[in-house]
Amino acid sequence: MVGVEVYPKNRLVSANAEQQISVTAIYSDGHTEDATHIATYEANDKEIAEVDDTGHVKFFEQPGDVSVMVRYLGQVGVYQASVPLGAPVNVTPQPRNFIDELVFAKLKRVGMPPSAVSDDATFIRRVSIDIAGRLPTEAEAKTFLESTDPAKRDKLIDTLLASTDYADYFANKWGALLRNKRSSNTAMRGNYAFHGWIRDSLHKNVRYDEFARSVLAASGDMGQNPAATWYREVKTMQTQMEDTAQLFLGTRMQCAQCHHHPFEKWSQKDYYSFSAFFSTVGRKPGRNPGEEVIYHTRKVAQTANKKDGCLLYTS
């Protein structure tokens, strides 16, 4: 068997509605079989809906999104549904970008009115805290509130993003995400160098893909190439891959180590093939006590699936 097909895949349903899910098993020779009554089901939010052993879903009055995971012979499918709040959404703010368009479309679909556009005083306070990690100065607030420039909000955002306050604030955030912590006194040189590298990258507005590549492909001494400090805290292929997926791709892969990811398309094969990318990472003692030199060996990137021992490669 190569997969399962769940029908319907997603629906907008009313409160207290019911839905029967059907499950079809798909085999490599092209034939299919009904697996509805032998698959297993699990809802991820039992306050919104519950599902029985036959795939019959019962919704409650709680609005929101719910997913029902369907498992059969190691394959996974998902049914997704939304119970709308039900309020009329006739007017939305003017979209400023494609993210606004997607958000407003979702709000209309689930009947959730958007918040009103904030006033100028609220905006400058919020955006200063969010971007620079501080309240606006008296001079900044006075200049902004007195301005009649229709583009003043965009200009304020650009000014804050170009400031050292932004670089300082987000360097702390990224430092935590990249596990830049002092595990010992001998780690201090790498810690300070890595923090400075992150801060400078943000202040120079280094492209996101370039920033990620510099971390993942880092090699050498941690004092000379601070980005290599990341490898000091994430030592195994699995940890390196899981951190990479979550930090840079916004995807949690942990579940796929043992089985198909319950609410995503990722399989065990994907998990170990991705992990294989880091199989070429090596380390050796550095010149200073407690430090390491990171290097990448010249070999085929591969690892074995722990379940069946099959070798998998990074494609």
Task: Label every model-predicted segment.
Residues 1-104, 109:
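Extracytoplasmic soluble-region selector
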Residues 61-68, 82-86, 90-311:
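Short, structured secondary-structure elements
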